[in-house]
């Protein structure tokens, strides 16, 4: 389902989807691999590191669970179930410094409109560690990716698989300095001005200096696609990139 490299050992963290197992594959001797098998949860999917890059947070999406794996000690820390929404789909998730709860990792969901924040600081915030500490209401179900950056004050959440076209073509933007503030809706596909057709946007990335956010507006093969560039600070449109090479 997913594979990442450990920041503590010469190991790959391999999540084997249906088995409910996470394998810590030690690779210095490629002909004699040493594998530590960690029992996590079935239907593992994608996930990402906490802010320290020690704990891997992986979604077992059909179990509505987030498994927390300690890549330093090679062991399961916890299966977070309480408070997790329906079918979590974090991509890599998003690391945030919550004003109230400290460092947290966030995921959105395919099956509902919630965004849950899980505490990830057992040293300084032990009461919040490995628990859902805050739940936000997003734009809608069908979310695939949730993104931010240490230098950004925004949390970007998509809903490209939502059955409502207006929702699937837009993004919700939360203010990280005030998470109780209502999110702003940006109509990404409308900004692209592609006419009829675009049914979803997907894939958000930032420039190296984190001044701009790039969105792909995907369309059918016989229609135009585009890249929409947003200023991360002002949330205003900077540019729309159109090219026939984007249509394939």
Where do the protein language model's features map onto the residues?
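Predominantly soluble domains enriched in secretory-pathway, periplasmic, or organellar proteins
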Residues: 1-248
